[in-house]
Amino acid sequence: MAEFKEQVLDILEEVCENDIVKENLDVQLFEEGILDSFAVVSLLVEFQERLDIEVSISDFDRDEWATPNMVIKKLEEIR
């Protein structure tokens, strides 16, 4: 579990190019401008390639993926 969480946070940090995603797991990714629609596509591709978790863009709801903690929770539900 802890390893999975670290992997997700590493991917988030790389795609967002911002280490706040590891420092504050409740930061609002979209409201704070850390993540935008272009980055979401990159994020989903990275999740598929590195974690073997496929999330289609149509299944991505910004309200359910708004913080690093929420991203981890959603991916745990899917995998």
From Swiss-Prot:
Pathway: Cell wall biogenesis; lipoteichoic acid biosynthesis
Domain Carrier: 2-79
Keywords: Cell wall biogenesis/degradation, Cytoplasm, Phosphopantetheine, Phosphoprotein
GO BP annotations listed: cell wall organization; lipoteichoic acid biosynthetic process
Modified how: 4'-phosphopantetheine is transferred from CoA to a specific serine of apo-DCP.
Signal peptide: none
Sites of O-(pantetheine 4'-phosphoryl)serine modification: S37
Annotated GO MF terms: D-alanyl carrier activity
NCBIfam families: dltC (TIGR01688), PRK05087.1 (NF003464)
Role description: Carrier protein involved in the D-alanylation of lipoteichoic acid (LTA). The loading of thioester-linked D-alanine onto DltC is catalyzed by D-alanine--D-alanyl carrier protein ligase DltA. The DltC-carried D-alanyl group is further transferred to cell membrane phosphatidylglycerol (PG) by forming an ester bond, probably catalyzed by DltD. D-alanylation of LTA plays an important role in modulating the properties of the cell wall in Gram-positive bacteria, influencing the net charge of the cell wall.
Stated family: Belongs to the DltC family.
Protein's recorded name: D-alanyl carrier protein
Species: Bacillus cereus (strain ATCC 14579 / DSM 31 / CCUG 7414 / JCM 2152 / NBRC 15305 / NCIMB 9373 / NCTC 2599 / NRRL B-3711)
